[in-house]
Swiss-Prot record:
Subunit and partners: Part of the 30S ribosomal subunit. Contacts protein S5. The interaction surface between S4 and S5 is involved in control of translational fidelity.
GO molecular function annotations of the record: rRNA binding; structural constituent of ribosome
PROSITE patterns for this protein: RIBOSOMAL_S4, S4
Gene that encodes the chain: rpsD1
GO cellular component, one term: small ribosomal subunit
Spans annotated as Disordered: 25-48
Xref: InterPro entries: Ribosomal_uS4 (IPR022801), Ribosomal_uS4_bac-type (IPR005709), Ribosomal_uS4_CS (IPR018079), Ribosomal_uS4_N (IPR001912), S4_RNA-bd (IPR002942), S4_RNA-bd_sf (IPR036986)
Role of this protein: One of the primary rRNA binding proteins, it binds directly to 16S rRNA where it nucleates assembly of the body of the 30S subunit. With S5 and S12 plays an important role in translational accuracy.
Keyword annotations: Ribonucleoprotein, Ribosomal protein, RNA-binding, rRNA-binding
Pfam families recorded: Ribosomal_S4 (PF00163), S4 (PF01479)
Protein name per Swiss-Prot or TrEMBL: Small ribosomal subunit protein uS4
Family: Belongs to the universal ribosomal protein uS4 family.
GO biological process: ribosomal small subunit biogenesis; translation
Organism the protein comes from: Methylobacillus flagellatus (strain ATCC 51484 / DSM 6875 / VKM B-1610 / KT)
Amino acid sequence: MSRFTGPRLKVMRALGIDLPGLSRKTIEARPTPPGQHGAKNTRRKKSDFGVKLQEKQKLRFNYGLSEKQLRRLMVDARKGKSPTGETLLQLLERRLDNVVFRAGFAPTIAAARQLVTHRHVMLNGKSVNIPSIRVRVGDEISLKASSTKLPIVVETLANPPLTRPEWISWAEQSQQAKVAHLPAAEDVPFPVDVQQVVEYYANRL
């Protein structure tokens, strides 16, 4: 399954939650599920499988991943010493495209991914183009001097979509972000029951 490129607000309405990595829009104005009259303005009670699928989809859509990419991260998370769910969330937050987004360089993770793939992003002073790089403590993230003048960057730095998390320190003068410490599960900027995601993949890997 490839990355989603359809209507983002429709996805968030279906999941019943705002996903800041997917879109700056919110479902506040249209909170009902998509469909004729919002399925009579009600949300049917989901089955256990439906709940697990919904929590998994929150992660996949917010971080802009294909099913294959998310499965691969789950495999890696299982190898860690910490609880699988916590490790999965940390791996997601540590992706370079997410860090570029959380640092305030881009309005969404998709936009941050474009900055990376087009080589606007510098990691420890070197140009990189791989969005899935996992940052480590002490890593420094910045943009090329010419890239800081891009309209999307200027606008987002002036009006960031989210408050920068504590695990990312920020140097205003140099416009450089630094990984102060590794992110924790509570640093994920939307509610998700990650244990449901772990259970979803329990018999699928």
